[in-house]
Amino acid sequence: VDGPGIRFVVFMQGCPMRCKYCHNPDTWNFTGGREKTAEEVAAEVLKYKNYFGERGGVTVSGGEPLMQIDFLIRLFTILKSKNIHTCVDTSGICFPLTGSEKYEKLLSLTDLFLLDIKHIDAAAHIGLTGQKNDAPLAFAKYLSDRKKPMWIRYVLVSGLTDDDGALMRLRAFLDTLDTVEKVEVLPYHSMGEIKYEKLNSDYCLKGTAPPARERIENAKRILGAGK
C-alpha cells in the first residue's frame, strides 16, 4: 500500500486533518518523532538502495508530508541524484488552490503520488476529517493536468464512506483525471485504536466492524479498483 516494489517509508509529523478512522494519531502534532535533516534521512535510505531493485524506492507519508514541503524538496533532490524512485503519500489538503512554485518543484522531483481521497461529498468530508475537500480535489486535477502519475486510495468504512451514491460520484470525478494508474480500496480496520488509548484520546469509531467482503467488492467494482 506504500507504492510499487520494496519501499523505504518515511513518516512525517503534523497533519491538519482529524480523520475519524486515522490509525496514526500520534503523527497529528509536530511534537512527536525525531528531528532529522534531509541529508540524514537520505543517508539512511542509501543503506538500503540495493534492496529497491527496479521498482522500489522511497515513500514519504505521515501525518501530512506536504506540511513540510521544503524538507520534501531537499530530500527528493538528493534521492533523485541517486536515481531513487520517489513517492508522496498525501491527502492533498495543504495544496494552495492558486498553485505554487514549490509544488511545481516538488512535482519535478516526484515519480508518483498516492492520493488519499477521504470523501467526494463536501459536507461528509468535513464531518469525517474536520476539513473541506476543495484542496484535495483541486490537487488531483493539478496532478492530472501536469501528467503526474497517481494512485487513488480510498478507505472504506461502513456507514461513513460506503454509500453507493457517493462512490459513484467519486468514480465520475476519477473519470475526469488522465493520470490515475490505480485505485486502491482500503477496508477499515481498528488496529490504530490502541494508539488513542495511549494518547488518552477517545476513539470515535470504537466498536465499528470492518466492512463485509461484498461491500468491499462492491466499492472496488464501482471505483474501478484492481484493474
Where are these regions (language model features)?
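Canonical Radical SAM [4Fe-4S] cluster-binding loop centered on the CxxxCxxC motif
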Residues: 1-36
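Short glycine-enriched, charge-decorated loop/helix-capping segments at active-site entrances
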Residues: 26-30, 126-132, 200-208
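A structural motif corresponding to the C-terminal lobe/cap of the Radical SAM core domain
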Residues: 181, 197-222
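Short, amphipathic alpha-helical "lid/cap" segments that border enzyme active or binding sites
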Residues: 38, 42, 167, 171, ...
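Radical SAM enzyme core and accessory elements
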Residues: 225-227
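Conserved AdoMet/S-adenosylmethionine-binding subsite of the radical SAM
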Residues: 42, 46-50, 54-57, 62, ...
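Short, conserved loop/turn and helix-capping segments at secondary-structure boundaries
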Residues: 35, 130-133, 210-213
